[in-house]
Amino acid sequence: MKVSALAENLRGSEIIKIAGEINELKRQGQNIANLTIGDYDSNIYPIPDELKQGIVDAYKDNQTNYPPADGVLLLRESVSAFLKNRLGLGYKPNQILISGGSRPLIYSTYLAVVDEGDKVVFPAPSWNNNHYCDLLKAKGIMVQTRAENNFMPTADELRPHIKGAALLALCSPLNPTGTMFHKKDLEEICDMVIAENKTRSANEKPLYFLYDQIYSQLTFGDNQHFDPVTLRPELKDYVIFIDGASKCFAATGVRVGWGFGPEGVINNMKAIVGHMGAWAPKAEQVAMAKYIVEEVKVNAYLDKLKSRIQVSLNSLHNGFQQLKADGFSVDSIAPMGAIYLTLKIDYTGKTTPGGTVLNNSADINFYLIKEAKIAFVPFSAFGTDDDVNWFRASVGACTFEDIELAIPRIKEALAKLK
């Protein structure tokens, strides 16, 4: 049946393909440690009790009609206070937009500042920027990053592509790597954006800067989150922040995200979100507004969540470092933030016991699913070249025990390759 050219040519998700393989094996009765999806198992990581009860209370209070187009005022006021208290960012409620999770905010940012044919610059690996470019018929410029920089882009890597671009889209802590910008590196990128905008006339669109910090509350050890506006306040007119409750409160299904930035851009995004009907449910907004200003309760929840996530990430990292020490061609980058660990499994060209040659990272992944009963996501799903044998491991849907038990299976599976 004939459909639109856009729908016909839109690329599917490699993660969904992997999920299909896992589901088929589960249907056959196999137990797979699924480290693919960037989500939480809510039986392992439930949302805060106070937030859950607040949602129930809001429904009992009949908070079930349409919310305001830009979000419930009480929530925008609470977000404003949350940003000031936790990140030192000063944004008024009229500079804040609420939506059903952060995804509509990213898409509406693209729609608000990018025209067909415009250049959008983003790093590889990164999450979904290539698909948003496809939807808008924008010219996506994927800048390949390097392991020695923790797969975070540098100003020197971005600079050759910035001239004339409409949008620079960055994320820290980064999905899929779980790594973060160091202060100096982000400062250099900020200075590059400032310099580029000084070359543009009043009749030209500036270079806008989308900064996704949905994982900003999930950092580990001495790793500190930095943002462009704190480092360079003169960027405030150009930076659109993406943030929300999904990751820091294990509330991916609650669907409350917030974006903030220049009032004019936010107003345009509000109209776009309204036409899409991508609002967050009103009851959830009311409950979130009350919860996020409870600083003691928020701190207690975050401390516990971060501690448990870090234990799982460290377990996987330490397991891979031991495999590396044992002579296996693997590596990992120490966890810095988010719920992800970056893994290297460099077995391209090896042959399985069944005689199949592993030609790329996808082949390696599907081999491990079948032989080691564990699933990752190759960086090729996030825009890197197929021959880059690095992977994302997401620990939010597995227990610490699942991860501990998986390491010996990985070792056994890799030892079988010739």
Place the predicted regions along the sequence by residue.
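Generic structural signal for small/hydrophobic residues in well-ordered secondary structure
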Residues: 18, 35, 55, 79, ...
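Conserved core segment of the aminotransferase class I/II
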Residues: 52-53, 78, 232-310, 314-325, ...
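Conserved glycine-rich beta-strand-loop-beta hairpin in the small C-terminal domain of fold type I
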Residues: 303-317, 329-351
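Conserved core of the PLP fold type I
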Residues: 57-204, 216-233, 358-360, 408, ...
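PLP-dependent enzyme catalytic core of the Aspartate aminotransferase-like
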Residues: 81, 85, 353, 357-358, ...
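Short, surface-exposed loop/helix-turn segments at secondary-structure junctions
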Residues: 273, 350-362
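Short beta-strand
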Residues: 32-34, 242, 330-336
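N-terminal small-domain helix-loop-helix segment of the aminotransferase-like
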Residues: 4, 8-101, 108, 292-294, ...
